[in-house]
Amino acid sequence: MSAKWEKKGTNDGVLTFSIEQAVIEKGLTQAFNKVKKNLNVPGFRKGKVSRTVFNRMYGEEALYEDALNAVLPEAYEAAVLEAGIEPVAQPKIDVESMNKGEDWVITAEVTVKPEVKLGEYKNLTVSKQDREVTDEDVEARLKREQESQAELVIKEDAAAENGDTVVIDFEGFLGDEAFEGGKGENYSLELGSNSFIPGFEDQLVGKKAGEEVEVNVTFPEDYQAEDLAGKEAVFKVTVHEVKAKELPELDDEFAKDVDDSVESLDELKEKFRKELTEAKEAAAEEAKDEEAIRLAVENAEIVELPHVMVHDEVHRSMDEFLNNMQRQGISPEMYYQLTGSTEEDLHKQFEGEAETRTKTNLVIEAVAKAENIEVTQEDIDAEVKDLAEQYNMPEAQVRKVLNNDMLEHDIRMKRAVETITETAVEK
């Protein structure tokens, strides 16, 4: 095997390599064994013709294509290793020569990972994060819990106020014609929740049960239903009931109803404070880590990102997003219809994020290389054990899903990230 790498562009080049006679012969044997199974030759039983007879009748060249397909993947991988390059996409293969009795010469047009010139990535200065939990934070959490425990009580002959819930029938019209999706019966709407079109809820404030009212609105220009976007509409609304929230008393009984592990309101407040502190600490650490990584990426220099890397990352993001939609019962076609968008729009939406993620991954890989981060088999075994416990599955199953190379790469990336984040200083 001899391999030669010739750079043609920032991230592109041509890899020329040869396939030796011994390897070619192995490929020819595989190709012949595949072909002869279905070969009918006079004087021979089906599939029993000899290689010599085949070559005399059809010529050895008839096997070249299948032979090349058999040996090319391994030969290409060996050439890549010898040349010391890291391809990021499938190569475009061309045959330079396939002469009998000579090594075959192959060329491959290859896109490789771009060069990353690291800047500062250790001891980076990041913004000081807010980790303090105040009494106001605890009271706000308590208030949310109180709101969630509230009961709705009918207001007899009383006008609706913001915060009240009205039970309504409604039907929307464009001019004199009702439009699809604009009708509802016995719908509970909290006034001030902004869950309806802007202006709709405001016009129900002050109304009482039994009243009928016409609500005039204008749909937003960016409304998801294109046939309604920017248009004026009238909703005929009947108010059936007006309900007010009745909040429970903030006392020890309330505390025990919320959490049976506490005996008093003070205990509940302390538990909330602890939970809020843990959450704020986790959020602060995450924000610190994200800023440190962002700075490390900004400090690095990548002349040009290969388009194919960004393209692949976009499609990974799109597939993940659409699969999540599918799990919620929304097909891609339905999503595009509901949002008035196209596959191309979604592609553009993910492009910026994909470019950032691609740059970030390249910089983290470069840090791992610069730090000479090594991963042992013991490290891999420990990672498999952790993943098996985390996902409650046998270790053997983890190894089936993630091979050693994938696990080694993940561990190296984690340690490179830790090199950046654990040395960052808040100021």
From Swiss-Prot:
Keywords for this protein: Cell cycle, Cell division, Chaperone, Cytoplasm, Isomerase, Rotamase
Keyword Chloroplast belongs to the record: no
InterPro entries to which the protein is assigned, alphabetical: PPIase_dom_sf, PPIase_FKBP_dom, Trig_fac, Trigger_fac_C, Trigger_fac_C_sf, Trigger_fac_ribosome-bd_bac, Trigger_fac_ribosome-bd_sf, Trigger_fact/SurA_dom_sf
Domain of life the protein comes from: Bacteria
GO cellular component terms listed in the entry, alphabetical order: cytoplasm
Subcellular location(s) of the protein: Cytoplasm
EC number, as in UniProt: 5.2.1.8
Pfam families: FKBP_C, Trigger_C, Trigger_N
Broad EC category: isomerase
GO MF annotation: an example: peptidyl-prolyl cis-trans isomerase activity
PROSITE patterns referenced in this protein's UniProt entry, alphabetically: FKBP_PPIASE (PS50059)
Chemical reaction(s) catalysed: [protein]-peptidylproline (omega=180) = [protein]-peptidylproline (omega=0)
An example Gene Ontology biological process: chaperone-mediated protein folding
Positions of the PPIase FKBP-type domain: 163-248
Domain description: Consists of 3 domains; the N-terminus binds the ribosome, the middle domain has PPIase activity, while the C-terminus has intrinsic chaperone activity on its own.
NCBIfam families: tig
Function: Involved in protein export. Acts as a chaperone by maintaining the newly synthesized protein in an open conformation. Functions as a peptidyl-prolyl cis-trans isomerase.
Family designation: Belongs to the FKBP-type PPIase family. Tig subfamily.
Protein name as annotated: Trigger factor
Species: Enterococcus faecalis (strain ATCC 700802 / V583)
Taxonomic path: Bacteria, Bacillati, Bacillota, Bacilli, Lactobacillales
